[in-house]
Swiss-Prot record:
The lineage of its organism: Eukaryota, Metazoa, Chordata, Craniata, Vertebrata. It is a peripheral membrane protein. Keywords: Cell membrane, Cell projection, GTPase activation, Membrane, Nucleus, Phosphoprotein, Signal transduction inhibitor. Transmembrane segments: none annotated. Residues 56-171 form the RGS domain. The gene is RGS8. GO terms for biological process: G protein-coupled acetylcholine receptor signaling pathway; G protein-coupled receptor signaling pathway; negative regulation of signal transduction; positive regulation of GTPase activity; regulation of dopamine receptor signaling pathway. GO terms for cellular component: cytoplasmic side of plasma membrane; dendrite; neuronal cell body membrane; nucleus; perikaryon; plasma membrane; synapse. The modification Phosphoserine is found at residue 26. It is found in: Cell membrane; Membrane; Perikaryon; Cell projection, Dendrite. Interacts with GNAO1. Interacts with GNAI3. InterPro entries: RGS (IPR016137), RGS_RGS8 (IPR034949), RGS_sf (IPR036305), RGS_subdom1/3 (IPR024066), RGS_subdomain_2 (IPR044926). Regulates G protein-coupled receptor signaling cascades, including signaling via muscarinic acetylcholine receptor CHRM2 and dopamine receptor DRD2. Inhibits signal transduction by increasing the GTPase activity of G protein alpha subunits, thereby driving them into their inactive GDP-bound form. Modulates the activity of potassium channels that are activated in response to DRD2 and CHRM2 signaling. This is Regulator of G-protein signaling 8. It comes from the Eukaryota.
Length: 180
């Protein structure tokens, strides 16, 4: 009933929220979570590109819409912190200022790695402690071990489920229909 009272301009937000509130296999309106305007983004996304995401996890991560689709899928599984951590590490590696490097390193650690972090990633004790030690003298590689573990976890666990998900299969179907 509350959805009926919302202004029309919020329809996109309702669609996104509705999509994310369901299990990944029940979300068929993938366009709602694309980073650009859905119709324009879907027109730019070729069937070939979306199909290539199945070639490897790294191919998926190298594509803007692949990351957006995978993020939306992970949200339905309540595990988007893994991708967010991986992306934060990638951005961290681009840091050139030593002062910013230190503050960013501590921010990433506190948000994702520390025990009881708000978006704590699932890594083992040894990796967590090695990362903590690396923060004593932060460098561009201080998160490499933890990032590698999270990458491996997503690649072996979440990525195969994403490729089998209705969300991904619907996206492929939509992009193929657009070509017809």
């Amino acid at each position: 009933m509350a959805a009926l009272l919302m202004p029309r301009r919020n329809k996109g937000m309702r669609t996104r929220l509705g999509c994310l509130s369901h299990k990944s296999d029940s979300c068929s309106d993938f366009t709602a979570i694309l980073p650009d305007k859905p119709n324009r983004a879907l027109k730019r996304l070729s069937t070939e590109e979306a199909t290539r995401w199945a070639d490897s996890f790294d191919v998926l991560l190298s594509h803007k819409y692949g990351v957006a689709a995978f993020r939306a899928f992970l949200k339905t599984e309540f595990s988007e912190e893994n991708l967010e951590f991986w992306l934060a590490c990638e951005e961290f590696k681009k840091t050139r200022s030593t002062a910013k490097l230190v503050s960013k390193a501590h921010r990433i650690f506190e948000e994702f790695v520390d025990v009881q972090a708000p978006r704590e990633v699932n890594i083992d004790f040894q990796t967590r402690e090695a990362t903590r030690k690396n923060l004593q003298e932060p460098s561009l590689t201080c998160f490499d071990q933890a990032q590698g573990k999270v990458h491996s976890l997503m690649e072996k666990d979440s990525y195969p489920r994403f490729l089998r998900s209705k969300m991904y299969l619907d996206l492929l179907s939509q992009s193929q229909r657009r070509l017809s």
